[in-house]
A protein has these predicted regions:
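Sec-dependent signal peptide cleavage junction
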Residues: 25-45
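Active-site-adjacent "subsite" loops/lids of carbohydrate-active enzymes
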Residues: 64-91, 161, 166-222, 226
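The substrate-binding groove and active-site-proximal loops of carbohydrate-active enzymes
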Residues: 77-88, 127-141, 199-214, 264-274, ...
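Aromatic- and glycine-enriched glycan-recognition loops and surfaces
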Residues: 85-104, 131-155, 273-278
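Catalytic domains of carbohydrate-active enzymes, especially glycoside hydrolases
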Residues: 92-118, 227-229, 322-323, 394-398
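Aromatic-lined carbohydrate-binding/catalytic grooves of carbohydrate-active enzymes
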Residues: 105-140
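Polysaccharide-binding and catalytic clefts of secreted carbohydrate-active enzymes
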Residues: 183, 187-319, 331-332
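Substrate-binding cleft of secreted/luminal carbohydrate-active enzymes
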Residues: 322-340, 348, 355-425
Length: 425
């Protein structure tokens, strides 16, 4: 997940989401790694004070199996800039992550295995990632994913494979696109060139086409079939823009066809339908090979932003056949003037109507002790600990922390120590 704020059966279910979201948009800057969101005038008040530096009384976890995960983005395992790109060097880097995360009380790693339409494993669908080989398409001579799963399990930790489903290239990364990349194969094929969509300097798979959705789903199934992962997770990157030019040809063709039998869906309704079709297909393909693997999504915490990106989170949380868990990225604190953390947690709890869908809360370790959000993250050193308490009171099923690197920085040291006390109480 580069850092972002929040980065069906009928598409009309978006009406339910809008009602619950109360048109709230978080007015918070989340840095260069996750997307920013627009603010709304709705200003619910927090019921939690975070002004005190005192250690707070922990709320007990409702289950001994509470999720305590940390995201490991591709930057944390990037070997492309390392002088030593060997298998031994990679394993040493990842072993340090496993031992460090376990020491911090984590029980699950969410690791980037397909950041740019590529693979940190041997794939029949996607080229080798430049993250491990230095250049996309170059075989590193070993299987990073196989080792990471084995290393995590040896330490008693679960491993979830993290996928960016649509992103292929952004801001010149990766700098070289492999010859066996679907982008290379499709861009010069008149019948397939629209399967790739462009937004600014980014290139993306276009989920309007069933063939593209099948490719993404087959890629997820490949992981489920070939590796002993405990889960597979999509990030929040779906449609990167609301600009109708992004998929104009596909939508125009749909509209012409749909007009013959009635009124076409709006662009946003249609896009949400495309993403729902993708999510449902991925879910079914994973379950077809291993029903025990969890499939989850980590959408932005702002529901309106999710809708704008084509993410019909209300349907995913209420209808069978989409996800096993949802983990909104609630990267706000209790002082947020638009959406305090506790209000956001309660809103998401209300969205989860399918009792088989687990609710995890994504927490912003990276903001702890920083100047983010007008310095409000410096007002207390127990914000994360209080957020865990709120999550437990809200009956959520666990937490995911962004990100691994920030569990070990001086900036976040006191916050991490305090939240560990609550997690391990």
């Amino acid at each position: 997940m580069v850092i972002k704020l929040f980065h069906r059966h009928s598409v009309f279910s978006c009406v339910c989401i809008l009602a619950l979201a109360v048109s709230i948009t978080m007015a918070v800057n989340f840095g260069s790694a996750r997307m920013n969101a627009k603010a709304s005038t709705e200003k619910p008040k927090s019921t939690v004070s975070e002004s005190s530096q005192a250690v707070i009384a922990p709320v007990k976890a409702s289950s001994p199996n509470e999720m305590r995960a940390v995201w490991v983005p591709f930057m944390s395992i990037d070997m492309s800039r390392e002088e030593d790109k060997s298998e031994k060097a990679f394993k040493k880097k990842f072993d340090n992550i496993v031992s460090g995360a376990k020491k911090c009380g984590m029980n699950t790693l969410i690791v980037h295995v397909r950041p740019y339409g590529d693979a940190l494993y041997k794939s029949s669908y996607f080229p080798w990632s430049h993250i491990v080989g230095g250049t996309q398409g170059v075989n590193p001579g070993y299987d990073p994913l196989a080792y990471m799963v084995e290393a995590a399990h040896k330490q008693g930790m679960q491993f979830h494979a993290w996928i960016n489903p649509l992103r292929i290239q952004l801001s010149g990364t990766p700098s070289i696109i492999a010859q066996d990349n679907p982008l290379t194969k499709w861009k010069n094929d008149v019948s397939k060139k629209d399967w790739i969509a462009t937004n600014g300097d980014g290139k993306y798979y276009n989920p309007a086409y069933s063939q593209v959705r099948k490719l993404i789903a087959d890629g997820a199934q490949e992981i489920a079939k070939n590796y002993d992962v405990d889960g597979i997770q999509f990030d929040d990157y779906f449609y990167p823009t609301q600009n109708p030019e992004f998929d104009k040809t596909a939508y125009d063709n749909y509209s012409k066809s749909a007009s013959k039998n009635g009124k076409p869906l709006s662009l946003m309704e249609w896009r949400r339908g495309n993403i729902n079709a993708l999510v449902s297909l991925v879910y079914s393909e994973i379950k077809a090979v291993n029903p025990n693997i969890s499939f989850g999504i980590a959408p932005q915490g702002n529901v309106q932003n999710d809708l704008n990106m084509g993410a019909d989170v209300s349907t995913w949380c209420s209808v069978k056949g989409y996800v096993d868990y949802i983990c909104p990225q609630l990267y706000v604190n209790f002082d947020n003037p638009v959406l305090p953390f506790d209000s956001a947690a309660q809103n998401w709890h209300k969205l989860v109507k399918n009792t088989n869908v687990k609710l995890y809360l994504g927490l912003a370790v990276y903001k702890s002790g920083s100047d983010a959000d007008n310095g409000t993250w410096k007002k207390s050193n127990n914000i994360l600990a209080q957020q865990v308490n709120v999550g437990r009171k809200t009956n959520c099923d666990g937490f995911m922390f962004y990100s691994w690197d920030y569990l070990n920085k001086d900036q976040t040291k006191e916050e991490v120590q305090n939240v560990m006390k609550v997690l391990n109480s």
